[in-house]
Amino acid sequence: MKTFFENQILHLDLHGIRHPDVEIIVQDFVLSHQEELPLIVICGNSAKMIQIVNQALTKIKVDFEETRY
């Protein structure tokens, strides 16, 4: 897990994180940095990872948009 600023936006890179750990990492990241919105979570191309992140954000009632690059 790596966090970094790019264009003054804080990013969380989930490459290398195991699926069972993703939910708590994402929720902690968002809740810990909610005063710095917007935030970006990088999931990679794994449909499962994207699904887990979407569910994690939905559980804590965070509005988000999914963007693919």
Show the residue positions of the predicted features.
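Long, charged, low-complexity intrinsically disordered regions
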Residues: 1-69
